[in-house]
């Protein structure tokens, strides 16, 4: 992302296009392609991937670092899609949730950590969540079935149990 004080407008717009197209537009287009199929099939399940920046561990504020403005905006957009779609699609038996994950061992985080000269010591890398842990949690969420939770941003954080929280009650929207 960009530094709103130091980076040029050109860099900011270029970074915006890249991150919003990847993080938000990708989720939007994939969801819009899948939703008609899910509705016509009698229901289904959408799991969006957001970030712990919008659903932080207890005791922490939302948002990433000082240079995370565009990344955070794109992930907040995913929150908006998750919330709106879950309300609209609930009557069609389509559940929509998001995982708001902390650092997960992946090619992306390894690349970013190296690019930005972040600590890659064994202790740090070992602390990252493993993909199989998230896959297990994903299956648990899916297996809740048609009556399972919808519209939830589920925080999954380092140094916390990797588990589903209690299901939240769906609140009515102020807007139709």
Positions of PLM-derived features:
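A short helix-coil junction within the Rossmann-fold of NAD(P)-dependent oxidoreductases
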Residues: 2, 33-42, 56
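C-terminal helical subdomain
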Residues: 98, 118-172
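Catalytic loop of short-chain dehydrogenase/reductase
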Residues: 7-15, 45-77, 82-83, 87-91, ...
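A short, exposed helix-loop element centered on a Lys and neighboring polar residues
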Residues: 31-32, 83
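A glycine/serine/threonine-rich, flexible loop-to-helix segment
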Residues: 2-5, 60-63, 91, 101-128, ...
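Conserved Rossmann-fold SDR core element
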Residues: 79, 89-105, 148-154
